Amino acid sequence: MTELEAIKARHSVRKYTGQPIEESKLNLIREEIQKCNSEAGIHIQLVVDEPKAFSTGVFKYGVFSGVRNYLVMAGNKDAEERIGYYGERIVLLAQTLGLNTCWVGLTYKKIPGTFTLEEKEKVHCVIALGYGATQGVQHPMKPSEKFYEYDGVPPTWFMEGIEAALLAPTAVNQQKFKFILRDENKVQAKPLMSLAGYTQIDLGIVKYHFEIATGKENFSWD
């Protein structure tokens, strides 16, 4: 499965079977985490076989069950976009390995001793990880023209990027982002106003999807 195929196959999953993740798959995820942390200067950590973080659901949105593995998405205060970008890179790897995921902003507890924080670091969110009880369902799709600006008929490569971005997970499915095509191949991605927050993390996620669909070599970020 390619990353683009993983984008199309991935859906947020909140109910898990509890089936242990094979050590070979965990090692691949650990290797990717190490690469992402090194490249981005963030502090993603994998927690395995720990059920307490999701043992109670006090929020109405997104009740979880069976979660025993998750990624702690930690970094400095200004790391939000990188958290989204590199976190989604790991999410798509997990999808290619036959695993399911869900980005989680609120519906979890921080369990002491399961992760560490360096000075000035914080936990931005977590990502549930494991074998889903289902494969999830596609979130409602909004018209693509709401998510970009371009004076004229946009090129095919740009629209392929937009369609991939629309498949990205965002906080409460808010999709508060817009892509602007300037000149021939310069693209600006910007977050929009949101009461739910997490827009910078969402921006990193959708930018990664956009890059996978278009190819980083075919455009530059403005």
What role is predicted for each listed range?
Residues 1-222:
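Acidic, surface-exposed loops and disordered segments
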